[in-house]
Amino acid sequence: MENTVKTKKKYPKGFYVCAFSFTLERMAFYSCKWLIALFVAKTLLEGGLGLTDTDGAKMSANLVAFTYLTPIFGGWIADRWVSPRICVPLGTLLMGLGYLCGWQSATQGSVAMIWLMIILVSIGTGLFKGNISGINGRLFEDKAQLDSAFTIQYSFVNIGSFIGTTAISFVAYGIGFGPTFIVCALLLFLDTLWLIFGGRAYFGDIGKKPFKINETNIESEKDKQKSDSEPLTKQEKHRIGAIFLVTLFSVIFWVVWYLTYMPIMYHWGPDFDYANKANWMIGNFTVPSAWFDSLNALCCIIFGPILAAVWTKRANSPKGDLSMFKKTALGMLLLGVAFVIMAGAEVIRGENQANLMWIVAVGILMSLGEMVFSPLGNSFISKFSPPRVLGLMLGVWPFAIFIAGKSYGYLYEYLGKYSFAPAYGIVGAIVLICGIVLWSLDKKFNTLVE
């Protein structure tokens, strides 16, 4: 009876403050991720900076990369020195100012202002991203609600991404790049006010002091120091090895996953005369390339609950759930197939435009690959990392995505030296081979965490 009552508990109102804050922030971020790649490579006459597609890819890659690195430091600051309730709205304010720098870049034709935008948005994300989740988690007295709560929060993230990327192209082509950056900034300024007033109303005292303040250890300081100085056991070393192994494969996955967006815009997309290798027309309507990003968000919204049900059913079956190694391998296999399809579409089209359904298939497969293992990284690390190095190990995952983010722009530049079909077909084959190897060695790798 008690369990039934618990499942019917309402989420605290502060949870919805945090979740909707994520929606506003992600609306702006994913819009800007698409916008910066387009704006940088568009000609001066078209309102862009007039740089190359590889410059656009690298700029977009830097935005992705540094927004994964800075939350490591932002969490450290909120843990020890500055109130998370200050960090979070300060972060959204800095992001808003960053997007205003994008507006100034469009007004002045300044590359330096785009770099300043990336810096401010990255610092702001560092103060916001992890700390808003930290506040959110502490709002719940019943910790059994956390898994479902963060699943719902993830849906709010994807809703923000979907709305932003679906609408942004109309704004960009309707009123220009500069005003579009202003729209992104206004979303963050609104988010700042939402957090300040919503936090006052519904957060109570949570987050007023750094997270580590008032948190007590069961161990005495003397015992803790003794524990920290003891060498790692053989099992702990094996588990750390397993974490690094999964992380290594995740770097390969994310480099290729983020790379997908570059040929979609600069090879297949309708935005550049030298691209346009696919037919984006439906009747008299040209499908915006930003909707490829929208497709990813929509897939996460639709297939997320379905996959969760599949994993739950699998976990309750006699065979049990797939291991993290197999889920990582499955994600890589799906992504590899997406690249093989993209290379195949290039061969099949000949001198004509490819059917848009090829692009849709690529988007669905890469999204499914993401959903198979992406949400499980921190869970895997939290489950198997030795407690004394948990913080360090949790930092490994976002650092891996930072490395991937920094790399994909350069990989896109390198692949541009070769014919499209063989270059991207080889990338797909490499990812498929990695997935097959990881799947086949699953039993051996699982001994590391048993």
Predicted regions mapped to residue ranges:
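Intracellular loop-helix junctions on the cytosolic face of multi-pass helical membrane proteins
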Residues: 1-17, 142-147, 168-285, 307, ...
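Short amphipathic helix-loop junctions that connect adjacent transmembrane helices
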Residues: 34-57, 260-291
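Central cavity-lining transmembrane alpha-helices of secondary-active solute carriers
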Residues: 60-79, 294-309
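Glycine-rich segments within core transmembrane alpha-helices of 12-TM secondary carriers
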Residues: 67, 147-173, 185-191, 296, ...
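C-terminal ends and interior cores of transmembrane alpha-helices
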Residues: 93-109, 332-351
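Hydrophobic core of transmembrane alpha-helices in multi-pass small-molecule transporters
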Residues: 111-128, 351-372
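Intracellular juxtamembrane helix-capping segments at the cytosolic ends
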Residues: 127-141, 371-385
